[in-house]
Each structure stands twice: as structure tokens, then as C-alpha cells.
Amino acid sequence: MDKNRFFRAIPKVDTLIEQCDSAGLFDRYGREITVDCIRERTEALREFIGKSEDETEIIRRTESLLPDIASAAEKLFSPNLNPVVNATGTVLHTNLGRALISRKHAEHLMAIVSGYSNLEYDLEAGARGERYSHFEKLLCRITGAEAAMAVNNNAAAVMLTLSALCRGGEVPVSRGELVEIGGKFRVPDVMAQSGAIMVDLGTTNKTHLSDYEDAINENTAALLKVHTSNFRVVGFTESVSVAELVELGNKHGLPVIEDIGSGVLIDLSKYGLTYEPTVQESIRAGAAIVCFSGDKLLGGPQAGIIVGRRDYIKKIKKHPLTRAFRIDKFTAAALELTLQEYLSEENAIRNIPVLRMLTQPPMEIRERAEKLAAMLKNVNARVEVVDCESQVGGGSMPLERLRSSAVAIKPNGMTTAAFEEALRRAERPVICRVQEDRALMDMRTVQPGETELIAAEVAGILGVK
């Protein structure tokens, strides 16, 4: 194939500038941005011609160069972070933003982020206040801790705690708890950055209380326990409880710090889920500091929450890294509103989207799946309701499988892969999972009002019979 003729067919930049100006692109996007897009898209076309052997596609792309330039310019002015429909069945989907904030709080949150607020202003005293004041009392009431604060994520919470309380000192931790928390970030790395000296002990599957006792010396600053929330070791295993560590710590005058991970504030085993230790249990057991995530099983915004003894929290608040890790006004507001729901367990289960999705009765999910299937009965595909399993996600309850129902769609005249891609590229992207060459819409994670949206997108892509 003679590719030179295709390269020669690419319009000159000056010609494209004139065409874009005539098409009104300069008026809409400005000359500088339009010219940048011209250069970017012509270079992309050259690269494609150099690699491709598909003459038809080369001609199509060359003929659509002007619309392609306009699309590239428009994309610069359009939001890239957009809402999607989560039909994967993974409740805490890390790639899709993890926990949802309740829509009932949207108006208040919009008022906070779009206007001034009393973020660090004491309205009663008429003086500077503290941003933790909006949720600290709630955290203390719910968990039983003496004091509380929050930073931007749980890795920061652990690092800040260790840096403030243990820098330069040794911190024994079980080898079986040296987890990787995602994105190749690991507990040993976080500890190293904090300035604490990690002392790993025990083995992957077994750690005894005597291992901790043997590791304690005059340089020991604290004892660390990390809840392995994103994996399980089963079989010939043994670990040391928080209560046992606290007893040992008290004997040697050492605080116990626990990274409990997912931040469970309600015993979810009452609702048919796998038991996960709660923050309250750790505080009652005597842990000096407990760190956990805000956007996992707690069901709030991304945050690293630190609760525990007043003297330790006071010291952490004064650490220089606290400002580097501090939360913004949106997080403070969303955390307060989420925690208020926990003042009543019934309200929390009903109003916090994560908890509501996790505790949905299977029959309710089935009914919603049947509703969507009925709406799709005339589309050009084979559609049926199937039983499936959802998962918690977000590194929480890794062994938990939740009974659910999905709408399985096998398109006619289109591959399932092409259909899944079309759903992803829709105006309101629909993210599903592909199983046995069918697109599955797991209704557990489909939110109110989204069923109709899915039906419209599917019909638009597949057409009707």
C-alpha cells in the first residue's frame, strides 16, 4: 500500500486554520486552543496512517479531520470526571468512586462548596474555630473515643499517627498484617515514610503474643495492629487480638495503634453479612488510637479518620503533617452529614447508600431486574433475568458474596464486547460486567432513577426488533 498518497491528502495546517475559522471554532474555543487541536489531531492522523493497513479507515479519518478537531476542542471545555451508572454489582467500586453520598444531602453540600461557610469560624465566640469541630463530637459519641480528627485518607491517617507518636522509635507489627493497600502502597512503605522503625514479627499465618513481648525493648514506641480487611488467610492460623495487645502494652507502658481499615460502625452480621470488627469494639478493648477509612463501609467521603485518647489526638493535631493532610470543606460537611445518620442505626441502614445496597433483600433486587427486563423486551437482543453474586469491593469483606439478580443481555448483530464498549461511551456511561458472553446489569448497585436511563441507552444502541 502506497501510504505517501494518504500523507499528501492531509490538509495543510493553514488550510485547516481557515476552515476552522469559517466553521466558528475560533469564536467558540479561541484561536490558540483551536490551532493546538489542529496540530494534535493531524499528528494523530499521521501516526495512524503510518501504523494502519486499513485504507477505508484511513480515508474515513482523513475526511472527518475537521469534525475531529472540533470534537477535541469541545472536549477540553467539557468535564472529564462525570457520573456513570454502576451496574457491576460491586458496591464499593474503587475505580467508580467508592461510597456514594446520600442524595438527600446534595442541597446542603452544594451550598457549602459554592458559598462561604463556618469551616474554621466559631459562630458563638466570633473567633477562629477548628474544622474538626463539625464532626468530632459525633465521632466520639458513636465510637466511644475521647477525641477525634480526620485527614484526607486512611494511609495518611496511619502515617501521621506513627510520625506524631512513634518517629524514631520501634513499632512491632505482625508479618501477616503487612498488607498492600492498593496502587502498590504498602504498610512497610507508609511506616518508613513516617519515621517509625518497623519491627516485623511472627509469620504470615501465625503470630503469638510472645512474639510481641520478645520484640519490646527500651526503643519501642507503640504496638501496631493492622486489620487485614482486603484479604484473608485461612487454615492453620493464629493472631493476637487488640485486647491482648492492650494488656501487653499496659504492662510496658506502650500505646496500641490499630488500623482497622474499612471503618465499620455497625455490626453488619445482624444483617446477614460477614462479621467485621467495629471501631467501637477496638476503643472498648483499649486501643489508644484507631484509624479507618471514611469512604468504605462507613459510607461517607474519602477521609482517614483518627479516634482515640485525647492526649494522643492532641499531639497528632499539632504535627506539621496535619496541615498537609487536612480535609477540605466538602469532606468536613459530607462526613458530618454521614455521621449524623449513625445516631440511629435504622436511619443509617436506610439513608446511607452503601449500607442500603449491602442490606437489600434479594427479592427486591429481583423485582428491579424484572422491571428492567420488561422495559427491554423489544430491543434487538436476547434479554433475561439471571441470578448472580455481587461483591462488597473497596478492599472490604473479600470473601463476601451477596445474592443478587442481573439482567443478562446478548445482543443480536453486534458482539458483546462492542455492546459493552458502546455502553461505556454513552452520554451517561453504563458500566456493567461481561460474563459468558453476555452483558450483565447487576441491579444491586443501580441507583433509583437509573433503570430508565439504562433502558434508554440499551435501546439506543441495539434498536428494536
Residue ranges of model-derived segments:
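Conserved C-terminal alpha-helix-loop-beta "cap" of PLP-dependent enzymes
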Residues: 362, 366-449, 453-454
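Long amphipathic N-terminal alpha/beta scaffold segment
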Residues: 52-101, 107-108
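Conserved PLP-enzyme active-site core in the AAT-like
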Residues: 125-342, 377, 457
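Short Gly/Ser/Thr- and Asp/Glu-enriched loop/turn motifs at secondary-structure junctions
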Residues: 10-11, 29, 85-89, 298-301, ...
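Structural motif of enzymes handling amino- and sulfur-group chemistry
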Residues: 311, 319-320, 327-378, 386-391, ...
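A short linear hydrophobic-aromatic micro-motif
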Residues: 80-81, 148, 292, 428-433
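Glycine-rich phosphate-binding segment of PLP-dependent enzymes
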Residues: 38, 43, 87-88, 98-124
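Long amphipathic alpha-helical segments
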Residues: 1-74
